[in-house]
């Protein structure tokens, strides 16, 4: 897998967290860099750990399904991409202002961790699909974590100004990227076998 593909996966995996961070930034009102760093560390650590957990699970099952692993990777990535696009389109009517009271009540680290875990489920699925490829999961997980950390900082700081408009669009773009990556994996495998 090329470094560009790994970076695209990192960016795609961080879009859910970016969207959540925009909501958090909108709820804080006037976020400081310290607020953004706090949220980014929690999201970044969890987003780094979940693809590793998924990869470990995938490693256990990989020798049973090696003959069609590329189809699994394609299906998971494309399915996640479609899901992200649908969520991005569904949430277009929501505003961060509507959710501000909830965010203010639930700003403790445990709630942030739960939100980070919820937004990183797709990263766990990515980890499962990467178990079927010849790739170093530590590098991919680190890139996902760093992309998430960076995008969450920007999301929190931009949240008050941008609201959910950009957050929803980011999720749509992330979904498109995942579909492209899944299609590329399938194409590369099929072109190497034929």
Swiss-Prot record:
GO molecular function, one term: manganese ion transmembrane transporter activity
Membrane topology term: Multi-pass membrane protein
Spans traversing the lipid bilayer: 3-23, 37-57, 65-85, 112-132, 137-157, 170-190
Subcellular location: Cell inner membrane
This protein's record includes keyword rRNA-binding: no
GO cellular component: plasma membrane
Keyword Ion transport part of the UniProt annotation: yes
Keywords: Cell inner membrane, Cell membrane, Ion transport, Manganese, Membrane, Transmembrane, Transmembrane helix, Transport
PANTHER family hit by this protein: MANGANESE EFFLUX PUMP MNTP-RELATED (PTHR35529:SF1)
Job of this protein: Probably functions as a manganese efflux pump.
Protein's UniProt name: Putative manganese efflux pump MntP
Naturally occurring in which organism (per UniProt): Xylella fastidiosa (strain M12)
């Amino acid at each position: 897998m090329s470094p560009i593909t790994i970076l695209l996966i990192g960016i795609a995996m961080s879009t859910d967290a970016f969207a959540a961070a925009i909501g958090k930034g909108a709820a804080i009102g006037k976020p400081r860099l310290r607020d953004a760093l706090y949220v980014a560390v929690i999201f970044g650590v969890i987003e780094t750990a979940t693809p590793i957990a998924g990869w470990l699970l995938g490693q256990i099952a990989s020798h049973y399904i090696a003959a069609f692993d590329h189809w699994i990777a394609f299906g998971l990535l494309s399915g996640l991409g479609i899901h992200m696009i649908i969520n991005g389109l569904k949430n277009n009517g929501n505003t961060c202002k509507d959710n501000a009271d909830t965010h203010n009540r639930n700003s403790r680290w445990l709630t942030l961790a739960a939100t980070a875990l919820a937004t990183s489920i797709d990263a766990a699925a990515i980890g499962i699909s990467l178990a079927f490829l010849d790739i170093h999961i530590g590098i991919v997980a680190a890139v996902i974590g760093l992309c998430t950390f960076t995008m969450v900082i920007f999301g929190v700081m931009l949240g008050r100004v941008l609201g959910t408009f950009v957050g929803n669009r980011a999720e749509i773009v992330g979904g498109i990227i995942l579909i492209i990556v899944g299609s590329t994996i399938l194409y590369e495998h099929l072109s190497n076998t034929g």
